[in-house]
From Swiss-Prot:
Monomer. This is Aminopeptidase N. Binds 1 zinc ion per subunit. Gene3D superfamilies: 1.25.50.20, Neutral Protease Domain 2, tricorn interacting facor f3 domain. Its cofactor is Zn(2+). It catalyses: Release of an N-terminal amino acid, Xaa-|-Yaa- from a peptide, amide or arylamide. Xaa is preferably Ala, but may be most amino acids including Pro (slow action). When a terminal hydrophobic residue is followed by a prolyl residue, the two may be released as an intact Xaa-Pro dipeptide. One of its GO terms (molecular function) is metalloaminopeptidase activity. Zn(2+) binds at residues 288, 292, 311. SUPFAM superfamilies: Leukotriene A4 hydrolase N-terminal domain, Metalloproteases ('zincins'), catalytic domain.
Amino acid sequence: MAVKRLIETFVPENYKIFLDIDRKTKKIKGQVAITGEAKDSVIAFHAKGLHFSKVRAFSVDTNFIENEEDEEIVVKIGETGRVTVSFEYEAELTDNMMGIYPSYYEVNGEKKMLIGTQFESHFARQAFPSIDEPEAKATFDLSVKFDEEEGDIIVSNMPELLNINGIHVFERTVKMSSYLLAFVFGELQFKKGKTKSGVEVGAFATKDHSEAALDFPLDIAIRSIEFYEDYYKTPYPLPHSWHIALPDFSAGAMENWGCITYREVCMLVDPENATIQSKQYVATVIAHELAHQWFGDLVTMQWWDDLWLNESFANNMEYVCMDALEPSWNVWESFSISEANMALNRDATDGVQSVHVEVTHPDEIGTLFDPAIVYAKGSRLMVMLRKWLGDEDFAAGLALYFKRHQYGNTVGDNLWDALAEVSGKDVAAFMHSWVNQPGYPVVTAEVIDDTLVLSQKQFFVGEGADKGRLWNVPLNTNWSGLPDLLSSEKVEIPGFAALKAKNDGKALFLNDANMAHYIIDYKGQLLTDLLSEVETLENVTKFQILQDRKLLAKAGVISYADVVNILPAFTNEESYLVNTGLSQLISELELFVDEDSETEKAFQSLVGKLFAKNYARLGWDKVAGESAGDESLRGIVLSKTLYAENADAKAKASQIFAAHKENLAGIPADIRPIVLNNEIKTTNSAELVKTYRETYVKTSLQEFKRELEGAVALIKDEKVIAELLESFKNADIVKPQDIAFSWFYLLRNDFSQDAAWAWEKANWAFLEEKLGGDMSYDKFVIYPGNTFKTADKLAEYKAFFEPKLENQGLKRSIEMAIKQITARVALIDSQKADVDKSIKEISEKL
């Protein structure tokens, strides 16, 4: 049932909010006055978990009804027109990382509490009565009183105006949506700087971190704001930009306007021992949130079905920004590895959501934050659009969009209109097929009787209903003489031999630089030509060959055995991008390999041979002046070499562990997870798991914490695994925000999978209580769908989750997971024998 829009009866203009918060009792006392235009004599405001004692309108007490089911308070004001409605109420701090909530941490063994907020998507209503809809933009006058202690500070969207007897009064905000209001208070350390245009920028964290951990995020934030101001040709709209790392946080980060909050691992960087991947990740997260300060905050989607306007765009711009600020990082390679790969895999399952999807009820909003679709696919579409328009027109169109719609709300067509006005191209016609349709096409390229035939149809992994969908496919080819777009089902280009000669006899390839959202099935001579030139192709094209052949095999269009046969062509590659493509393919092939089998021995040998040259070249030690690509590649090479049971690598890993056993965090970060994993695999020691766990609890280094959790999950000891699982219910050991990651590490390992699955089923009520509404909640649906590969597990999954299909927040994820497991089981059954044979044959030949 569609939820009613409260803005239809009341349009807010200003909120005056006073909150009195006590950390010890976890109680909130609130007084809120909302001024706006009443369009009805009976109006409603969103409210959840708020206990009202008084409501006034037109300066007199008025009747009200609390409707818990619809999360509303209904107020009878008796007339229409401009009115101020005031509320007095009490509430409690939440413990599920939504609304106003506490974060817990320790400094030198002393337990402390920080208070922060998370109001996106519709959780402002848990803090104050509001029209909690993105279209209902208003200004906010915020005042906060709290049980202040020495060393405490408070920050919010706007600068603090004054402090009256412990009441912190903040300047009025600009006009914005309720979900962007934010504040944080507690004992925080910080560093500040300024942009060239005078915007004050600050990085904040608790004092259990090194102060130097703030340097990198502060530098990235300052430079990113400067980049966006220039690129958008639109000034940053606020006087400051605060960046706050919270010990407990449900998402990765949140773009609160001027007061951005982060999970600690997404913002803080160990200045003495951080990987290049960690720096890149933190930098792109910061750039993503800052992109939102314009696209999402200054201009906001009208309703949640256009969430992609926020997230797809910001996900694209984080890479545009970082490519400009740190060109040596080659971040577009990372885009292909992560975003493109994630989108292509998820978007190939029948039933997947489109980028733009109708939202009828707030319970469905959480399902929109599918990172593979709204973020990854959406950003891939923006990359495609930027290439089609050209960067100059793309940037100019954005500047026009911001100028035209600042402090307002939009739908997707408003963006297309601005880009079309600048470029002269019909952007809406080009983009509608991509944004409004689920899935993507496979373009088949073949030569028939000297005619090049290019055709498109929707690509499915597993069963899929072909509904005849067509896309405007940019061919982006390396040849001249071909059309720019494939918009029909098929196009035929005669005279292939002559056309090839005009293009110097080069092999034909499509989708140059992997910038458009489709894959290619090259048939016959076209594939042979590509593979014969593989050493001279661009790295991204080599990666695409591996990417596309892997997906075609996953769909059963070709066999994984065919893919194994092309692996020898990639043994001499030094590129991080290409070797990551190999690594991803190897992970897929592991599905067919039984533990302790002859095939496993042959596969280990094959993997070792594929990475032998890079192992000899890179070794274990970072070299001064080496490229970001080599630094990133080392971990992949070492991991695969150890998988291959390389005696030299295993001995070296053990030596490094022994040299650092008194300070595990001191292992060089780029090899640390490999060393930690190897020691558990080698010793299978329960005592070592205990050491890792004790280290996990004590350290404040979030990247190191994840590495330790990944390592302990490799233990093959049922008693220890049971203890690990039980510890997830102890927040002093594993924070609720980290349960999903820690649990998945156990689920993905064959030895511990049954125990992890049993724990999930037995503790579903606990997960609902702790994580219901949290952005990691549906991971407990999705992760098994990404992992299970047997008919028995499929039956168990259906038995447990099909009764939960009535939950709108989980429905699509459950249906998708069932299809994914079904397809995986069928794939293994149909291809295993051929894949085993090919692995053995190629391993012997290589």
